[in-house]
Curated annotation (Swiss-Prot):
GO terms for cellular component: Golgi membrane. The keyword Transmembrane applies. It is a multi-pass membrane protein. This is Golgi apparatus membrane protein tvp23. The keyword Membrane applies. GO terms for biological process: protein secretion; vesicle-mediated transport. Glycans are attached at residues 83, 180. The gene is tvp23.
């Protein structure tokens, strides 16, 4: 008899997640705004009610992804800081130390798929709202959804690149060869 295959790390199986509740909430928030919008457009027909409920779900998704799911599932976090004296705004990125925290392949795969698929679905809904001119008023809600989901997507993509670059720099400059060379040079200079 053949034994059933055991699920492997990296498969799209939420049971393999290191943080299954965080993952399920992440997926729930990501899909609930889309489902509310679709259900509202097709069945409810009350624009104000659907707009408010979808906006609340989008806001909860934005907050949860930015502050909880990103940190727990892939060890990334971002925020925006404003210099009060100059008024300049810049994004700050934070990533967990790869030596102290392991990110499971399943969590990583779910996170990045959910992050990139959601804006693509909202873009499809925007095209649909434009094509069916009777639903053009719904485009305002889709535009807000696109702004929120694309902001998180861009920020986490930059945060991931920043985290990979700093990890590479730490490995390059933290190695024993580099420390021996710099230690030898500094030792000669200050004898």
């Amino acid at each position: 008899m053949d034994q059933p295959l055991q699920p492997q790390q990296g498969e799209l199986n939420w049971r393999l997640s290191a943080h299954p509740i965080t993952l399920l909430c992440f997926l729930g928030f990501r899909s609930s705004a889309l489902l509310m919008y679709l259900f509202g457009v097709l069945f409810i027909k009350n624009f104000v009610l659907v707009f408010i409920l979808t906006l609340l779900l989008l806001s909860a998704d934005f907050y949860y992804l930015k502050n909880i799911a990103g940190r727990r599932l892939v060890g990334l976090r971002w925020w925006n800081e404003v210099n009060t004296s100059t008024g300049d705004s810049h994004w700050v990125f934070e990533s967990s130390d790869p030596t102290t925290r392991t990110i499971t392949a399943t969590d990583k795969r779910f996170f990045w798929l959910g992050l990139y698929i959601t804006p693509a679905l909202w873009i499809g809904l925007a095209v649909l709202a434009i094509v069916t001119l009777s639903k053009i008023i719904w485009l305002s809600l889709v535009a807000i959804a696109l702004i929120l989901t694309i902001t998180n997507t861009v920020a986490f993509s930059r945060c991931d690149r920043f985290g990979q670059a700093s990890t590479f720099a730490n490995r390059a400059f933290g190695g024993s060869i580099v420390s021996n060379i710099t230690g030898g040079l500094l030792g000669r200079l200050f004898k």
